[in-house]
Structure formats: C-alpha cells, structure tokens
Regions:
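Intrinsically disordered, low-complexity N-terminal regions enriched in serine/proline/glycine
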Residues: 3, 107, 226-228
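Short acidic/polar active-site loop segments enriched in Thr and Asp
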Residues: 34, 93, 140
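Domain-core and long-helix interface of multi-subunit machines
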Residues: 9-15, 97-208
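An N-terminally biased module of ancient metal coordination in phosphate/nucleic-acid-related enzymes
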Residues: 1-80, 87, 151-164, 168, ...
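Structural recognition of alpha->loop->beta junctions
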Residues: 88-94, 137, 200-213, 228-248
Length: 253
C-alpha cells in the first residue's frame, strides 16, 4: 500500500462531480492514508480564492489524514518555452506542473488523429516546452510525464526519441529538485503494451537521481489511493522506493 496520494481534484475543477472536500477527506481516512494533496487546476491569480476555500473546508473536516492544499498548473500553450499559465504560486503546499494541450495549437488531443501538427514538429515543441518546464525550481512535481506525448504521436515511431528528451529533462529535474509523478490515471490512456513499457521513462529519471512520487489524479472518491498501473511500473524499476510527501514538497518533518 502507498500511504499517500498527492494528486486529487475536487468538484471545483468542473469535471469531478461528487468530489467535495468532505468526501475526499472521508475517503482518505477510510483508506488509511497518512497524507493527501488536493491539487485543483489554477489558471490565474484569482483562482487562489478557490484554493483558500478548499483549505478552509479541509480544515473543517478534522480528519486523521494530513491534507496539503496545492494546485496543478499547466504550461502556457501559447508559448514553447515551458512557462506556466500563472506564476502566482505562493502559498501552495504542492505545485504540480505539466501540460495537457498541444503547444502553439492549444487543443486537447485524444489520439494522434487530433494532433494537427506534423509529428516531427510536435516533437520539437514538446521537447522545448518540457525542458523549459523542468527548469523552473518553483515546481515540486512534473505531472504525468509522457501523457501528452502518448495522445499526440505514434509511440511505436517516436518513443525511443522521446526517451532521449526525457534524459535531458531528468538532468534538469534533478538539478532543480523536481520529482516525477507516477500517475495512475495515465494508465487508462495507454494500451496494454505501453502500460508495460512506461517504466522506461521512470528508469531514466532514477538514473539521473530524480525523486519519484505517487498521485492518483483522482476525479472520483473511488479512484483515490488506487495504484494498479503504478504498480506495473514499480515492479519493473530497479528500486521501489517512492519519495515521501515532505521530501517532494521540500518541507521539514
């Protein structure tokens, strides 16, 4: 069992019905989790009002599980240098950053057929965006590494080249103390074959000294703390150790 979950969304994100803060805290206690991080999306400074609402509601729950309140922040898809959509990160316990949208295009692909860019052009933009993203020391965790890649290009053709990019990203992540997330939801976006290959991304991270951290990316209470896909990855890695929440968020015990 992994006794924490550092990527959970609430109903305030608009696509997680039933994920009240009270329901999240109740589920965390039912699962016996020691710590969770609630990490809804923020896009502008005004979104911190939502974060403070979540923080107040979590405090009112008075559950046994430690609740950190952070945010998932996207890169700005209007640019290709990895800058975030907002730099207003103060006061967030856990900053997860990643990208869901194709750089310079801004769409959310469900498969390569949705990517209007030529694959080679996408790979160039994906590389510059990823490397810029992990050059930002304000970030604690790189969200779901490779998920956009899997949705935008044919992995059979481009995965080996992507591993070379991940090597560069891992070196920068280690330098800036940015963990890589073992994301359970990503497994549902991959074929069975690629679920079995995904560990290779994290092997690159470990080789560079990058911390690994777990997050379910839950949008319903039942998904919290689940790690079926994550266990497929972990059993193939040379070490099963995950970083503790305090390590990733750079907190003192």
């Amino acid at each position: 069992m992994i006794d924490y979950d550092l990527h959970i969304h609430t109903e305030y994100c608009g696509h997680a019905a039933g994920m009240t803060v009270a329901a999240i805290c109740k589920q965390a206690d039912l699962l016996g989790l020691r710590a969770i991080a609630i990490t809804d999306h923020i896009f502008e400074p005004a979104d911190h009002a939502k974060i403070e609402t979540i923080r107040a509601e979590a405090r009112a729950c008075q559950g046994r599980c430690k609740v950190y309140v952070g945010a998932e922040v996207d890169v700005d898809s209007d640019h290709t240098d990895g800058r975030l959509v907002t730099d207003a990160l103060e006061g967030l316990d856990h900053v997860i950053a990643g990208f869901h949208y194709v750089p310079t295009v801004g769409n959310y692909p469900r498969g390569p057929q949705d990517n209007v860019l030529a694959a080679e052009a996408f790979m160039d933009l994906w590389q510059s965006t990823l490397l810029g993203l992990v050059s930002n020391p304000k970030i604690h965790t790189l969200a779901h590494p490779g998920r956009l890649l899997a949705a935008a290009v044919d992995l059979d053709v481009h995965f080996d080249d992507a591993l070379g990019v991940f090597e560069k990203a891992a070196a920068l992540s280690a330098k800036n103390d940015i963990a890589w997330e073992l994301n359970e939801l990503t497994g549902y976006r991959l074929s069975g074959y690629w679920q079995e290959q995904w560990w290779r991304i994290y092997a690159v991270a470990l080789e560079a000294g990058v911390k690994l951290v777990y997050g379910s990316d839950a949008h319903v209470p039942e998904s919290m703390g689940q790690h079926i896909f994550v266990d497929i990855i972990r059993e193939k890695l040379p070490t099963h150790r995950l970083a503790r929440p305090e390590e990733v968020m750079r907190l003192q015990e």
